[in-house]
Amino acid sequence: GHDSALCLLDTEQKTVFAMSTERVTRIKHDFLDITPIISEYKFDSVDYVAHSYNDFEDKGHDGELREKMTYNKDIEKAIRAIIKPTYIKDLNVSRSEKNKLIFKSLFTNFSAVKAYYGAKFKRALVKESPEGNRQAFTNYIKNNFNKYNLHPKEVFFYEHHLCHAIPSYYLSPFNGGEALALTIDGQGDGFFSKLYAFKSDTKYELIGQSSADFMGSGDRYLSIGRIYNYFTQAMDLRPNSDEGKIEALAAFGKADKDLLAQLKEATLIDKNTLSINYDIAKITPFYDIDFLKQHRAKMGDKNFCAVVQTYLEDTIVDYLNFAYEKYPISNLCLSGGVAANIIMSLNIYERTNFKNIYVLPPMGDDGLAIGSAILTALEVGEDVSWLKDYTMPYFGDEYTREQVKTTLDEF
């Protein structure tokens, strides 16, 4: 995944500490594990640890819980010890440049080079199985905590989209009452969207889901979020990071009717199962960067961006209107990376019957840390009803007024 984060839920003190890895490493949307946070902050004890994926069979072909991924993390740590990046752009080095840096480090940072090739060798020997994947990740997580004298009793694994939905409800004003919770992202555990109906904080059910079917190569998954990623890439921007620029530029354009119609014809909403599906033959061109760039050149940047933004708005509005027909509940919780699209949220408010909408502030994968922590607390029988009293979404560092004043006085 991306946007790794840590959330420490103290059910005795009724406190929350949460932080994204990028806040420590300064690598935007950092996909490394949470060890940079653990090394920077002191934690007295950790009873349980949870992870926000549980597809050990890799049915969704996202590779998140394959044993080889644990070695990929070790390889990444070794590379960073060699490159010493300050920002994410520093990681964009060519293969030849990387090899030169590795060779140079043979004489200046041999331990990092040894760790790099050691992890690559071990990765090559892996023979993956669902049981092996689970054990490998459990060991990887425990070993990383043990390095900092933290010894969790157990490691839990929860479904990706449930980890999005749970905090969007528990941290919302609707906690304890009825609400629908929609998750929408690129993909996770084989799906790009799920819809839950909450009756209360102890009773909820899955009422709709949309699968992110793998299209056979690279990062091509059938998904609204992934399509938006491809438009971002066609604009020569960074996918999973610069989508907000597409959303902003779209406001100055007008969607090309033909291309928008082509997108919509490839998209099918089943109002009975509450799922969003695709005609593979019709949607495939939208995963071709050359195809998209040709249309970008033809209609201009603003209108090109307006196509995918309008498509997103109309598709989600139509989907939620069908959902409301079956489940007429006026409260809606939104989470998942696509929920960062504020104009989509505005359209939901203006064009559906949902009157009260809550968007989880850490709507992306960083919010999964909070969701998995809440699910763990519930599983071990802890009370988390106090979470509804948290009205501010800031769970990181705290500073006193005196500390703030002292810093300001320095300027």
What does each model-found stretch correspond to?
Residues G1-F411:
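Short acidic/glycine-rich loops and adjacent helix/strand connectors
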